[in-house]
Amino acid sequence: MSASAQVTSIREINHDCSGEEWEARLDLAAAYRLGARLGWHDMLGNHFSLRVPGTKNQYLLNPLGLFFEEITASSLVKMDTEGNVLSDAPHGINKAGEVIHGGIYAARPDVASVMHLHSSAGAGVSAQTDGLLPISQNALILMDRIRYHEYEGPASDADDERRRLARDLSDGSILFLRNHGTLTAGSTMGETFVLMGRVERACEIQLAAQAGSAVHYPTQDAIDRTRAVGAKMYGSNSRSPGASLEWAAFRRKLDREDPGYAV
C-alpha cells in the first residue's frame, strides 16, 4: 500500500481543521498531483505552498519523503513564517522550502500561494545571461511580472536568503532564481499554478527557438501591446480572475482521473 493510501483524513483526526483550511488542502494537494502529471517533480525536491485561509503567518507545505504523486490533502504540513512546524511531519520538511516560501509570505500579504521548480527548461533559461527573452507570445504576456534573484548556493544553507528572495521578487509574481530554477507567486492556487505553466511553456519555446536558426524578435509595438495585455491577465476585471476558469478545469480533470488526492 502506498504512503498516500495509508493517510487518514485530517478531518477525522484534527477537529481544528476548518472547512476553509480543508478546501485549501484540497487545492494544494491537487496542484502536486497535477505537477506530477506534468513532470514538474525533481526527485523529492521542488515545493508548492498555500497560505492557510484567515491567517497571516501560516501556510501549508509538502512533507519531506513523498513524491508529488503521493501527496494528499491530509499529508500536507502546516508551517508558520518563523519556520515552526505546526502539524505532524514524520520526516520533517525541506529546509529550502521553508526558507523560500516563509520569506515571501512574511513580506507579501497579498500572496496566497507559491510554487518553486527546478525544471530543465526553467533552470536552463535561469542560467542564460539575458534570462527570458521577448521572443514568443507566451513570454511577452509574462514580462511585466518577471524578476531575477542571483544564485547564492543552496537556500537551505542561508536562512537570511529568505529576505533577499522576498526583496528581489518585490511586487512581481515570477522569479527566476539564477542557475537554479523558477518561482511563481499568486493570489490563488490556480493563478500560481497557471503562471508556472505559462513560464514553463515560454522557457521551452525559447530553448527550442535557440536550438534552430537565428531568433526572430517581434516589433517593439507588438511587444508593448502584448505586455500590456499580459499585465492585466487574471486581474479582478479579467475573464478569469485569479485564473479561476483554468484552475476549475484542472480540478475537474484530476477529480475524473486521480481522485485519491482528496483524503
Predicted segments — roles?
Residues 1-263:
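Glycine-rich flexible loops
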